[in-house]
Amino acid sequence: REPSKDLLVSRLEVVTLPSRLPRGLPVKSCAQELQLPVHEWPNTGPVGQFDVGVVASFGRLLSEDLILQFPYGVLNVHPSFLPRWRGPAPIVHTILHGDTVTGVTIMEIRPKRFDVGPIIKQEEFAVPPHCTTKELEEILAKMGANMLLSVLKHLPESLENKKEQPKGGVTFAPKVSVAKSCIKWEEQTAAQVIRLHRAIGSMFPLQTLWKGSPVKLMDFVEVDNIPGFADQVLNDDEAVPGSLLYHKASQTLIARCKEGWVGIKTVVLKKKLRAVDFYNGYMHSWFQQSSRAVHQECRFQTLRLSPAKKTLKERN
């Protein structure tokens, strides 16, 4: 509310959530580096001294009393093309479900419910092939920042042109629990496993069972990108989901899914092992006679975890 002819924002303060990290969340570290005042939720700082509030992946419902402190309300920068993927983990679900188009929505915050307010500005974005959650997050963050600046430059006009969200096409993006990282070999296709890895693999490495022990799988590849793989599989129809082969030329483990096969470059058992080391240490004896045969005992099995365990959501 301090007039300025040159600056779009003349005064800025930051509210962040509590964190167990020594330095707090990244947004707090950034604010401190820029010497901005920082308040920790539920403390929201001075009352009635700001024109507009902005939240991004904040994860807390704002009261009507708090929203009314801002003459222009509170804006939310949401990384999806609403009403698709309302909720705390929209980018994860965009990748998980194989969406080819997403976007960013600048919307007006309403009390008591998440992501239901009117749309102020919205832009679509084509999801790049093979994109991960982390990569898409970086792209949409920059896109959202530019859109927010555009809205703030013409705030009264932007608010006048806001529109309610469509009632159709609503989907929800709930938090993802660590149980989601367990590959269900009998239920998931190769394409679904690859998408799961791209969606949560950088935060929750995918997990399975090997001879009763939990192992983590990393560095997945599509078998279409492995030259000569099709020639190796002779009894494809007989392979039980979870069955393993080793492709020597590319040094890749190949696991059977509900449909198709998926390549794996790294296994974490007691320590991180390359596929060739895992093969030499744990699989070699089965394949001495034929590297092409699928052995029923040589397989991963589905690990079951409680969904109530640790959860993941996108938050700054």
Q: Where in this protein do the model-derived segments appear?
A:
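A structure-centric feature marking long, well-folded core domains of fungal metabolic enzymes
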Residues: 14, 107, 216-223, 230
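Active-site proximal loops enriched in glycine and acidic residues that flank catalytic Cys/His/Asp
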Residues: 210, 219, 266
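Short Gly/Pro-enriched turn/cap motifs at secondary-structure boundaries
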Residues: 196-198, 206, 242-246
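Low-complexity, glycine/alanine/valine/leucine- and proline-rich hydrophobic stretches
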Residues: 224, 229-262, 269-270, 277-280
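Short, isolated positions in well-ordered beta-strands
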Residues: 213-217, 262-263
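Short, charged/polar surface micro-motifs in flexible loops or helix N-caps
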Residues: 100-101, 190-191, 215, 220-225
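One-carbon transfer enzymes
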Residues: 1-204, 259-263, 269-274, 279, ...
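Short acidic-hydrophobic surface loop/beta-edge motif
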Residues: 183, 206-211, 253-258
